[in-house]
Every structure is written in structure tokens, then in C-alpha cells.
Amino acid sequence: MWHLRCSNWRGSGVFGMCFSLSGCVMGQWCVSRAIVRGHTQGGAVREVVRELLLGPQHHGYARLVDPAVRPLSCFSRGDTLYIDLPVGVLSPKYRTCSLHRAYELXERSVVLNCAPVKRVCFYVGGRAGFESDG
């Protein structure tokens, strides 16, 4: 298994990213690679969050959240990323992993891909959900 960080190849606007995903069988997880075109390094955090919320391309992995979920807000201050998800994330219409597992995998993916981010704080409907120790 190899890891790509959010790196720009030869100034082409092409970025490689790694995402941590939860397997549908026995709670396993793996790392999936993705190549994203046309995004700047500064927009990498938003792009990682967007890709995570879209879910995996392979049906053998559980979605982190319902595919219709869009963050109410997503911003960073210093080395911390704040993501506020709507209350609907608590009652998904599709098979997803638990919210705590979604948080763990999202945090791992964001920290791996976006070097300045060291902590992730999840909010649900504006209320604190999960946050890392940093």
C-alpha cells in the first residue's frame, strides 16, 4: 500500500489524494487513491471533504454519510478543520458506517492529504459531535 499526499504534479493542476474507507465486511478499512484535476492546493481541504462525502466508487466499501448530505459549513482555522453536517446525517437513508467511524476515517483522510490540518472537529446541526486531540 502506498500513500499520495495532496501534491501537484508538474504544475498541471492534477492532485493525488488518499482516502481511508470502511469495508462493508467485518469493519475492515483500507486506503483508496484518487486523482483530482483542476483544483488548487489551497482548495485541497474542501476537495477532500467533498470527495469523502460523495463516497467510495467501489460498492464493497461503506459510505461515510448519506450521498445527499452537504456540509452546512466547512472551514479551517490554524491547524483545525471544522465541518458542520446537517442533522439528517443521524438518520441516513442508505447504508453508512457509524457516525463515529465516519469521523475517524474522515479525520485520517483529511490529516493525510492536507498537511496544515492536524485536527478535525465534526458538528451536527451546529452542535459539537466529535473532535480530535490533535
Swiss-Prot record:
Keywords: Cell membrane, Lipoprotein, Membrane, Palmitate, Signal. It comes from the Bacteria. A lipid is attached at C24 (N-palmitoyl cysteine). Residues 1-23 form the signal peptide. The keyword Lipoprotein applies. A lipid is attached at C24 (S-diacylglycerol cysteine). One of its GO terms (cellular component) is plasma membrane. It is a lipid-anchor. It is found in: Cell membrane. This is Uncharacterized lipoprotein TP_0248.
